[in-house]
Amino acid sequence: MKPVVALVGRPNVGKSTLFNRITRSRNALVDDFPGVTRDRHYVDAVWNERPFTLVDTGGFLLSDDDFFAREIRGHVELAIEDADIVALVLDGRAGISPFDRDLADILRRTSKPVFFLVNKVENHKQREELLEFYSLGIEKFYPMSAEHGIGVEPFLDDMVALFPAPEPVVEPQAGSEQGEPDASEQEICIAVAGRPNVGKSSLINRLFGKSRVVVSHVPGTTRDSVDLSIERNGRRFRLIDTAGIRRKGKVRERIEKYSILKSLKSLDQCDVALILIDADEGVTDQDITIAGYAQDRGCGALFLINKWDLLDEDRKDQRRFMEDLRTKSKFLSFAPAMTISALTGFRTHKILAMVEKIHAQYAYRINTGLLNRIVEDAIFRSEPPMHKGKRLKFFYATQVAVKPPTIVCFVNYPDAVHFSYHRYLVNQIREMAELEHTPIRLLFRAKTGKIDFSGKSKLAERIVEKKEKKTTRRKKERKEQSRRKRVRDLKG
């Protein structure tokens, strides 16, 4: 198991900047506003070929005056408890604060290795003014500038030197093959999205079985997208608790704008979006806007109607609620919906099973022969409209990607395919391939140059052949009906 390293410290000392520097990413939001990071971020990193998990925590405050201070302090304590190594980040510009002294005292009492990092030290003149940090009762500290990457390497070298010896790597035997994992083995990435204060963080904590993200009645508690991993029944899930997405007119703080951009980026990266809706408030325009973001990004989707337990019996009309949801979200007709309560756990145990079902379809590849038979049958049942007096001709279809299933149909006039016929073909593929819970992308391309049909279904030829057989059969039927009529007339 990889060692866990926790970055702790008071707000705005540069923990998130250091986190991003070490992980070579922009996973944590960075701003001059204190308290930006309110939750823990877990990201895998590597230094000198030694892998470890780095944890970025919220700013640690010893005071209980503020609700978030209490919650964040609890998260830091959990991070320290989970960590193998703790790094206390201090501010070289601001100097030592009473909070730094209290936190240093707490960390000295732990049996775990503790590194003291003095951040925001950009030049030698500043280094000469750092003697006061020895008053914390420490033997060694690491002056650095996380923003400019100065002095970070010595800390990382000493840190990985404390890691247990790496396990020997077993080389694969000659002749063995390692293919791409199938859908049942892949980690499923889930984004928990919704308006502020609909219960996203409460749901994450319910699925994990312990407090992982700050929960509050105050809208906008989660300002950053928080990545967490969980394993259930041998299957790994990566859950992203996104910042609440408000209407544009209500987004005022600069840091909140950053958070919303990260939430939208999380939808880009996820396999399945859990779209939370507040049952007490009903389906709002903003809920549908968020659902639209998920549709635009092509991820799977699952509607979760949260706080169902808060409704009185007169309002618990699930059929009416679902009808309203389906009417307003016709573009996500494939997305299933469930009523839940993140607070009490009502039906939450069914969520990950449904996510697995959605993901299996989201990552599904349709056999080319079956796909062409489905399209062939759909065209035979309902012919495409004419284009400038000429019939649209479909040559063949092939699936070019998964997540979501993406299909290309080669036709003679791709721009002439009407949106209603496009929708008809998607619905036929969804029904016949049993992909009722995943988005499907259907693209039309022109057949250019010579195409080798070997090994492919000659769709156009078979459609013409079917039509000719149908025409011949109808001629025979009409001829037989005419013959029988003449016989009846002669007998009459």
Curated annotation (Swiss-Prot):
Biological processes annotated in GO: ribosome biogenesis
InterPro entries, per the entry: G_ENGA, GTP-bd, GTPase_Der, KH_dom-like, KH_dom-like_a/b, P-loop_NTPase, Small_GTP-bd
Positions contributing to GTP 1 binding: 9-16, 56-60, 119-122
Subunit structure: Associates with the 50S ribosomal subunit.
PROSITE patterns: G_ENGA (PS51712)
General function of this protein: GTPase that plays an essential role in the late steps of ribosome biogenesis.
Gene3D superfamilies, per the entry: 3.30.300.20, P-loop containing nucleotide triphosphate hydrolases
Compositional bias ranges of the Basic residues kind: 469-492
A Pfam family it matches: KH_dom-like
HAMAP family the record matches: GTPase_Der
Disordered: annotated segments: 464-492
Protein name as annotated: GTPase Der
Keyword tags: GTP-binding, Nucleotide-binding, Repeat, Ribosome biogenesis
